[in-house]
């Protein structure tokens, strides 16, 4: 119902908000660097 729609739209707004984008990018880069280190490659 309405509550679920509100939860979904709020979650979507949060997911696409700037602070969360920053966090996602930071986490992504950290993961990439971690994997690159493990396999002995340098991230491009």
Swiss-Prot record:
Expressed by the venom gland. GO terms for biological process: defense response to bacterium; defense response to fungus; hemolysis in another organism; monoatomic ion transport. It comes from the Eukaryota. Keywords: Antibiotic, Antimicrobial, Cytolysis, Fungicide, Hemolysis, Ion transport, Membrane, Secreted, Target cell membrane, Target membrane, Transmembrane, Transport. Its main location: secreted. GO terms for cellular component: extracellular region; membrane; other organism cell membrane. It is found in: Secreted; Target cell membrane. At high concentrations, acts as a pore former in cellular membranes and causes the leakage of the cells. At submicromolar concentrations, degranulates granulocytes and has a weak hemolytic activity against human erythrocytes. Also strongly inhibits the production of superoxide anions. Has a strong antibacterial activity against Gram-negative bacteria but is less active against Gram-positive bacteria. Also has antifungal activity. Belongs to the non-disulfide-bridged peptide (NDBP) superfamily. Long chain multifunctional peptide (group 2) family. This is Opistoporin-2. It comes from Opistophthalmus carinatus (African yellow leg scorpion).
């Amino acid at each position: 119902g309405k509550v679920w729609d509100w939860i979904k739209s709020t979650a979507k707004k949060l997911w696409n908000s700037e602070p969360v984008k920053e966090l996602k990018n930071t986490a992504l880069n950290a993961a990439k660097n971690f994997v690159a280190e493990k396999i002995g490659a340098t991230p491009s």
